[in-house]
Amino acid sequence: MTKTHTERPEGKRRAPKDREPKASTTSNRRISPPRPSSRGDASRQGAHEKAGGAGLSHSAPGAVVSRRAADRLRRGHLWVYASDVESITLPDAETPPALVPVADSRGLLLGTALYSPTSQIALRLVSREAIGEAEWLELMASRLRQAVGRRKPMLDGENDACRLCFSEADELPGVIVDKYGPLIILQLLARGLDSTAVREKCVRVLREEMAPAAIVERPDPRVRELEGLAAPSQEPLWLADAGAKVASTRFRLNGLSFHYDANAGQKTGAFLDQHANYAAARDWARRLGATGRALDVCCYQGGFALHLAEVCRRVTGVDTSRASLEVAEKNLEANRPRLAAEVDWVEGDAFAILRDWSDAGESFDAIVLDPPAFAKAKRAVEGALRGYKELNLRALRMVRPGGLLVTCSCSHHVGWAELEAAVAAAAADAARRVRLLERRGAAPDHPVVLNLPETEYLKCLVLEVE
C-alpha cells in the first residue's frame, strides 16, 4: 500500500556515468596545428617545422589542446573539456566529423577522439593512434566483445541482469549497454556515436554474444540535449520475433524478481550499480540481528527494501515518486511468498519524513539512505554535504543501539573523506557512536579505472550504530 506524505522530495535521479581505462604509450607522430594567429605562435610553429615535425596539412581536420589537457591524456584520461581546446580545424563546420585527430601545441599526436561541438566534454579519446571511421568501428566491435566477455561470468541463476558495457571503463566512451533478462538496452551518449553504422555494429556484436530477445535504444534526453542530438527512433533496434512486444519484462537480482519497463524509470530503468550492495545490506542486517523493523529511504523501485524484507519482519520504503512505488509494490508481490515481511510504501519528501519521524521518536533496527546525487558539479559540494549530514543525523537518531545504517552517495564530486566526515559530524550531533563495517562501491560490472577518477562515483558506508 502506498501512503502520501504532505511534502514531496526530489525524485531519485543520477547523473550519467561515463568512464575509461588506462591508456597505451603516446605515439611520437605529429600533426600540424592550425595556422597560428600571432607572431609568437608563428615562431614556435616555425621552430617545430624546422625540427622535422611532419604531419597533416594546415587544412586537415584536427584539434589542438592545452598542455593541461595533453598531460591528462598522457596519464590515461580520455576527456578533453571544451575550455582546453585551443583550436580546431574542420573540413565542414556545418557538419562536424565524428572523429578528429588530437595533438598538443607542439603538434605531437595524442590520438583520435569523438568530437562533440556543443558539449562541455568536447573530445573523448578512442585511440592513441590516428584512425579513421572504418578502423574505429572495428575497434569498437572488438572492445564491446571484450566488455561483454568480462560480464558473462557475473550472469547466473541468481542474476540475469548487469551492465555489459560501462562507457570509458570499457574503452568505449559514451557507450552504455545494460542487460535486463532477455532484453538489452543500448545508450549512445556522444554525438560522434549517433550513426547507423555504430548502431548496426553494436547490434551485431550483442546478437552474436548474448542472443537477446530484443535490443532497444533508450536515450538519455538530458545528455542528448547537451550533445545537440535529436531523439532516436522509438522502434527496437532488433527483435528476435518481429511480432513480439518488448516494452516490459522481468529480471533477477540476487534471486529476487524485478519488473522492467523500457519506457519508464530512471537511467536505463534500474540501478544495477547497487545490486551487490542490496545483498550486503541484507547480509549485514542478518549478522547484526537487525531483523525487526527496517527503513529504506529514497527506495525507488524497492531494491534495498525487498532485500531487507528477506530478513526483517517489517519494512518501510520512502520515495517521492508514486510511479516508482507502484513498481516497488509489483516487485513485492512478484516475490511472495518468499518475502513474508510486512512491507509498506510511503510517498513523500525524505527530509520532511525523517524529521517528523525522528521528532516523534520512531525507531528502526536497520536504515538505508540512498538519495539522488546532491552534487552534480564541484560548486554544489558544500550544499550536498549539508544534505548528507542532515539525512544521516535524522537516521542516526532513529537507529536502535546495535542496529545497522547503510548510507550511500552517488555524487562523484563528494569524496570518501568528505562523506565520512559528514556522517561523523551527524553522529556527533546525534550523540551516537558508529563503527565502520565496510566501504563499498558500485557492483563489479561498473568497474573503476584509476586513470579516470570519474568512473568512481558510488560510495556506500555500512555502519553499526551504538
Can you say where each PLM-predicted feature lies in the sequence?
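Non-catalytic accessory regions of SAM-dependent methyltransferases
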Residues: 1-181
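Short, surface-exposed beta-strand-loop junctions and turns on beta-sheet-rich folds
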Residues: 119, 192-193, 266
